[in-house]
C-alpha cells in the first residue's frame, strides 16, 4: 500500500518495479514495530547475527561479501550532461549510455526479492534546511542502517507532500558482481543509482551519494539562484 500520492515518488516506484520485478513492495513507515520485524527476518535469513543481549543489547553483526568491503572510486560516476560539469577529478560517462548499461543490470534484478521504499530526510523533518530523498532497495541492511543514519518514514512523506524537490535513488545488490558494480549520480536529475554492492558507503545513499556529491551540486545551484535573485 502506497504511503503517498507524490507523483515523482510513485513514478520512481512504479518504473523500478517494472524493471526489477520484485515479488512484493514494502513501504518503510519508520515505526519501531516494522524495523524490529525486519531485524527478525534478517536474523532468520542469516543476513544479520544477533549478538549477546546481556553484553551488547540491541546489537547485530552484518558481514560484507569478501569482494565488497570498500567504496570503489573507479566505479563511481558523475553523469552530468557534459564531461566538464563532472569536474576534473571524477569519472564521467554520457548519461544516456550509463542509463542503458544500468537498465540491463537492473532488469529482473529483484526477482524473488522484496523491494523496500525508504523515505528519508537529511536534517530535521520540516526544517527549511532539510533535504528529502527516496531510496528504493532490495536490502534489509540498507533499510536498517538508513533508519540509524537518517530520519525515515511517513513523516518525511507528509513533509514532502506533492513537491518534486526530492532526491530519487535506486539500489540493488543484484549479484554483487564487482565487474558490474556502479555507483552513479545524475546531478541534473537529482538521481542516484547503485548496483552490485551492499557496502555502506556505496549503498546508504544519504551518506556519500547525497550529502557529499549531489549536495555539492545543490549548493552551487542554490547559491547561483540566490545570487541571481539578489542581483535583481
Q: What function would you assign to each model-found segment?
A:
Residues 203-226:
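N-terminal switch/interaction subdomains of large nucleotide-dependent motors and GTPases
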Residues 18-22, 40-47, 107, 111, ...:
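Generic surface-pattern signal
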Residues 4-37, 43:
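N-terminal-proximal low-complexity accessory segments that begin disordered
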Residues 44-207:
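Long, basic/Gly/Ser/Thr-rich N-terminal segments
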Residues 227-232:
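Conserved small/polar residues in nucleotide/adenosyl-binding loops
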